[in-house]
Amino acid sequence: MARDYPLELYRNFGIMAHIDAGKTTTTERILYYTGKSHKIGEVHDGAATMDWMEQEQERGITITSAATTTFWERTEDGKTPLSPKHRFNIIDTPGHVDFTIEVERSLAVLDGAVCLLDANAGVEPQTETVWRQADRYKVPRIVFVNKMDKIGADFFNCVKMIKDRTGATPAPIALPIGAEDKLEGIIDLVTMQEWVYQGEDLGASWIIKDVRDELKAEAEEWRGKLIELAVEQDDEAMEAYLEGNEPDVPTLRKLIRKGCLAMAFVPVTAGSAFKNKGVQPVLNSVIDYLPSPLDVPAYMGFAPGDETETRNIARSADDSQPFAALAFKIMNDPFVGSLTFTRLYSGVLKKGDQMVNSTKGKRERVGRMMMMHAINREEIDEAFAGDIIALAGLKETTTGDTLCDPANQVVLETMTFPEPVIEIAVEPKTKADQEKMGLALARLAAEDPSFRVETDFESGQTIMKGMGELHLDILVDRMKREFKVEANIGAPQVAYRETISREAEIDYTHKKQTGGTGQFARVKLVITPTEPGEGYSFESKIVGGAVPKEYIPGVEKGIKSVMDSGPLAGFPVIDFRVALIDGAFHDVDSSVLAFEIASRAAMREGLKKAGAKLLEPIMKVEVVTPEEYTGGIIGDLTSRRGMVQGQDTRGNANVINAFVPLANMFGYINTLRSMSSGRAVFTMHFDHYDAVPQNISDEIQKKYA
């Protein structure tokens, strides 16, 4: 069966933003206008189509990225199609900091993005985080300044904030007509026409007319700026413009597209999804300015087993190339079981095909294939390059794995996942719960790589580790609801780390003589601190065979066994390197095990000698508050060992930026609510590890001794 839609009509894009910028509402409107959803779901009612987990509907936030396929043809009057029908594969991503990992996963497989801003708040902390992630994956984007109906909405302040906070060049392609309760519609700067919405019904009707006289001067000024940015993308257009010839509308659109794809600037439009104003122009802009899979460079991968990971195998959006795809999300579906969301980069995949998970070197078979619309699914028999589909029943595949043609193997991107910063102990209430809990935690960990499960060997407790309090709350909640596990939950604990403060040299000999074959190994190690974030490395500087090659893996194994449990309080040791510079062996009594024991003892001694110190996670905190509470909030942050970095204003609110140890931020939301009568809000995310003051370090060591 041939493909229904040529690749140039595909748009794989995500909707990204800060929490509460109206992302799910905007996606709901898009699904409504593109005809996939006949009743608009409001987040306030807990009925939004994309938010399909129970917890999402209760909390009114989006936790997991749901993928949806829908269709749109460019229109200006809402009736006449001005382009062929385009196929949109949309990924709705969460805006809460604890779920940054979901955003990371979806950006890795998208070609473009629509970034939403709250017209009142502008570029917020999570917007900056997501923006940086999108920069890293080189994802072209357009900006929709949403909530223009809100009190304090300021489009031009948002445009300024894009420039100041992200460093990108904003290029408004539309201006709002009015704001707050006077919002009427937008001025399209490309065509110089007004879109005036009639009432606030489902945006079904609007009038297109010439720009009214009182708005003309401002619109022409902004159009001039847009044209200047656009003609910079093409020498001929620039020459013509300098000779006094402005580009016509189709040429201007092509130039804006070129600039957007090159990430030279970011097209910006405006509206209010909740009031059904300005969403159709966003859909038109997705067609006009965001890339199709053909506009994106070939995806480079490396051959399985290539330790240098030299990326010299290209896979581009072409059905005739060998099949290659990336699994970017695992989801547990109540009816189908495990679903693996997959982006096809090249080739064709048919039901029943054999494929290889090249990341793990395991074979998989294609069972059921589905096109997803939030929680509804449509069974399909084949998928093509550029498609985003869900595969049911894969046994070995987890997030970030490559699936490919067995005869033409390649490993595509491997995603990087952050280390958890917070942990809680969970204990099942009954024996039956214990068995269910093991299964539940394994499932949840397969779905979410930023969530880890470990067993504390000393206490025998199960430890859940995650990215924040909300993250772990929701996982515990899912364990209870989806897997019916009853468990007792401990108080949250900080994931401390240990490191060293100076270089140390250790010469250690391990000897054991008990009749028969003995054990003998001598190692001389140098332990050196590295820059924060550099991690651990090992190097053998042995020359002349003082320690034979076959024993060196034993040395490294011994070192690694000590890294998991540092000398101060048993936390993992980070940011150091070890060099093996000398040693000795015995022809009969030496073995890999003897060298492992020797290096383990040498490391224990060496870490103490190198001045071990305790590190704690430091969070970047932003508090937005009415001015009258500023003094009290700053005082409270300082009392939590916080370092206030500065203040700013946003609209009529004050913005306080600070670095605060995570250990002092538990339950902060309740304190902030009572201090500000519920009017202040805060966001925080992990920034770096820093040394714990000695008096607090002593307390922690006593607690964990």
Swiss-Prot record:
Q: Outline the extent of the tr-type G domain.
A: 8-294
**What is the recorded function of this protein according to its Swiss-Prot or TrEMBL entry?**
Catalyzes the GTP-dependent ribosomal translocation step during translation elongation. During this step, the ribosome changes from the pre-translocational (PRE) to the post-translocational (POST) state as the newly formed A-site-bound peptidyl-tRNA and P-site-bound deacylated tRNA move to the P and E sites, respectively. Catalyzes the coordinated movement of the two tRNA molecules, the mRNA and conformational changes in the ribosome.
Q: What highest taxon heads this organism's lineage?
A: Bacteria
Please give the family membership noted in the entry: Belongs to the TRAFAC class translation factor GTPase superfamily. Classic translation factor GTPase family. EF-G/EF-2 subfamily.
Provenance organism:
Cereibacter sphaeroides (strain KD131 / KCTC 12085) (Rhodobacter sphaeroides)
Binding positions for GTP per the UniProt entry: 17-24, 92-96, 146-149
Q: What is its main location?
A: cytoplasm
Q: Per its record, what are the GO molecular function terms?
A: GTP binding; GTPase activity; guanosine tetraphosphate binding; translation elongation factor activity
Name the Gene Ontology biological process terms: ribosome disassembly
Statement: the UniProt record of this protein carries the keyword Cytoplasm: yes
Q: Which UniProt keywords apply?
A: Cytoplasm, Elongation factor, GTP-binding, Nucleotide-binding, Protein biosynthesis
- How is this protein annotated for GO cellular component? cytoplasm
Annotated localization: Cytoplasm
Does the keyword section mention Cytoplasm?
Answer: yes
Q: Name one Pfam family in it.
A: EFG_IV
Q: What is this protein called?
A: Elongation factor G
